[in-house]
From Swiss-Prot:
It is found in: Cell membrane. Keywords: ATP-binding, Cell membrane, Kinase, Membrane, Nucleotide-binding, Phosphoprotein, Transferase, Transmembrane, Transmembrane helix, Two-component regulatory system. Gene3D superfamilies: 1.10.287.130, Histidine kinase-like ATPase, C-terminal domain, PAS domain. This is Uncharacterized sensor-like histidine kinase R01002. It comes from Rhizobium meliloti (strain 1021) (Ensifer meliloti).
Length: 525
């Protein structure tokens, strides 16, 4: 019976016994003595109350027997523990024996960098490593707490956490620390990458920690320089955005006046033009102003896209109607060039949910460029079709085409493919860049196929249900541009630069800053 109780006690107590380390041997010794007492006590548990029933009534014998059994068991347990301990006499102190570590010093000396062996508290027991002498020239004696005390105060917690992870049965730990340098030359701290490996006994108890430290100061310096350059580039980009926004708004006011007054002159509202040369000059003024306003608007849109502040206004509209509107705006340009402009929209294409203004900007830029770089007698075709939930918009032409080695340059702001043909045409190289930006904002993309002398095919795909529209959450503060007082007068009201608006402007002396014409929107960059 006692043997059975002993095995049951072993099974119940095993999870609570320490696996090793300080005090584990004492705990196991005490447990063996308590186990013997428990086996005898559990065997005597039913006997003591039954024996008392011979002298006492049952109602009194059972509680009295249980109390007597419990008291006797506790006394026996205390006596067993006290009898098995040897207490130190005055002046004597007990120390747990130091764990025996495997002799791997010869191997440690072959490792690169600085190798330190630490106890479970992080104190250094020994120093090794192929480059140990070089490291020791730059630091104080690392033995004991010397290593920890030379770590930058902000990094000590991370170092101790790495050691704690090894105590919790982790098989590897690594940490970046800054180690104080004693040398007057160079920076105050060296950046160190410290990789730690535990040494355990057969039962898995942590005996020591081997740390291999490597100086990564040069890598840290390069990373800091890269971060500084990135911050400088971001600052320069922000300054560019501010500059473009300010300059664009500064240009819009005089441009609207130029366009409006050229309309007044061409309409002969204040007197007839005397000859054809005057009419030609007025037309040139209007065309040049329209083109410049288009460039300004495109630059402003590009700056918004790059800054992540171009807000899409998603709404349902019919693709066929949007294409027809763009085709009507550009038909005059195509007729003057002698280029045939056609469009084909499949029956399955009805309404889509997207930003109609951005959609038409994409079309106007692509069709305008196709007309511009197609010779007389050529053909420009616009196709629209649905592929799943994606709208596929294709603009193809029979123009000059693009060499294969130049295709990768397309879509970069202010970059144009230069040859004898393209030099005859004005432009900023912003058109295709704007197309790519607007397509990506919708969650779409742009692809280009072209061969020199054969023409170009540009395919734009965007989701028809706005499912891929980018969610732009501007964490940074918006770019604020302070405009001169005259540009603030009509900040909330948009006016057309046509004759009615000019009639009021001529009386008030003010011109709205947001004026524009359909023709201005039709010109491409």
């Amino acid at each position: 019976m006692a043997g059975r109780w002993t095995s049951l006690v072993d099974e119940a107590a095993a999870p609570w016994l320490p696996r090793g380390g300080l005090g584990s041997a004492i705990a196991r010794h005490d447990f063996r003595r308590l186990r013997a007492v428990a086996a005898v006590s559990l065997t005597a548990l039913p006997i003591v109350p039954l024996a008392l029933t011979l002298a006492l009534p049952v109602s009194a014998a059972l509680p009295a027997g249980a109390a007597l059994w419990a008291s006797a068991s506790l006394l026996a347990a205390a006596a067993a523990i006290a009898g098995g301990r040897e207490f130190p006499t005055d002046g004597e102190v007990e120390f747990a024996p130091a764990p025996e570590l495997p002799d791997l010093n010869a191997a440690y000396d072959l490792f690169a960098g600085l190798v330190t062996v630490h106890d479970t508290r992080g104190h250094v027991l020994s120093v090794h490593g192929r480059d140990a002498s070089e490291y020791l020239k730059l630091m104080r004696d690392p033995h004991g707490r010397g290593f920890i005390e030379q770590i930058h105060v902000s990094d000590r917690i991370a170092f101790l956490r790495a050691i704690d992870s090894l105590r919790l049965d982790s098989e590897r730990s690594a940490v970046d620390i800054r180690l104080e340098r004693t040398s007057a030359d160079g920076p105050q701290f060296a950046h160190i990458y410290c990789e730690m490996t535990p040494l355990r006994d057969a039962e898995g108890n942590l005996l020591a920690i081997v740390a291999q430290s490597r100086d990564v100061s040069e890598e840290a310096r390069l990373q800091a320089e890269a971060a500084a350059k990135a911050a400088h580039a971001e600052s320069a980009n922000d300054a560019k955005t501010r500059f473009l926004a300010a300059v664009s708004h500064e240009l819009r006011t005089p441009l609207n006046a130029i366009l409006g007054f050229s309309d007044v002159l061409a309409g002969e509202y204040f007197g007839k033009l005397e000859n054809d040369r005057q009419r030609e000059y007025v037309s040139l003024i209007h065309q040049s102003g329209t083109h410049l306003l288009s460039v300004v608007n495109t630059m402003l849109d590009m700056s918004k896209i790059e800054a992540g502040r171009y807000e899409l206004l998603l709404e349902p509209f019919r693709v066929a109607e949007a294409i027809a509107a763009c085709e009507a705006m550009l038909s005059h340009q195509a007729r003057e060039k002698g280029v045939r402009l056609t469009s084909r929209v499949t029956r399955s294409v009805g309404e889509i949910n997207a930003d109609q203004r951005a959609f038409q900007q994409i079309l106007i830029n692509l069709i305008g460029n196709a007309i511009k770089f197609t010779d007389r007698g050529g053909l420009v075709t616009v196709d629209a079709a649905l592929e799943g939930n994606m709208l596929k918009l294709t603009v193809s032409d029979t123009g000059i085409g693009i060499a294969a080695d130049k295709l990768q340059m397309l879509g970069q702001p202010f970059v144009q493919i230069q040859n004898d043909y393209t030099r005859r045409y004005e432009g900023t190289g912003l058109g295709l860049s704007l197309v790519k930006g607007l397509a990506e904002l919708h969650g779409g993309d742009v692809s280009i196929r072209s061969a020199e002398g054969e023409g170009t095919v540009i395919v734009v795909t965007i989701p028809s249900d706005a499912s891929g529209a980018a969610e732009r959450q501007c964490a940074d503060a918006p770019v604020t541009v302070e405009f001169p007082p005259r540009l603030k007068q009509h900040a909330d009201g948009k006016r057309e630069a046509g004759v009615p608006a000019l009639s009021e402007a001529l009386h008030t002396g003010e011109i709205g800053r947001e004026g524009g014409h359909g023709a201005a929107q039709a010109k491409t960059a």
